[in-house]
């Protein structure tokens, strides 16, 4: 038996990661390495959104 998955909590945490990544981007200013790495981080967060947050939204509507 697999443990229950709390998609709402995961969705909240993903949104929090997105917010923090934006803060890092603002704090990093024009440092090229920060700009590149935040861009990569946001792409990874987007994949999490596709995999988790979108499913969470579907589950809420059913």
Q: Which residues does each predicted region cover?
A:
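Short, charge-rich amphipathic interface segments used for partner binding and complex assembly
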Residues: 29-62
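N-terminal acidic leader/helix
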Residues: 1-29
């Amino acid at each position: 038996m697999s443990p229950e998955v709390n998609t709402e909590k995961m969705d909240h945490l993903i949104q929090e990661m997105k917010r923090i990544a934006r803060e890092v981007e603002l704090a990093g200013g024009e440092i090229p390495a920060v700009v590149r790495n935040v861009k990569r981080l946001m792409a990874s967060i987007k994949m999490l959104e596709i995999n988790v947050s979108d499913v969470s939204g579907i589950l809420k509507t059913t």
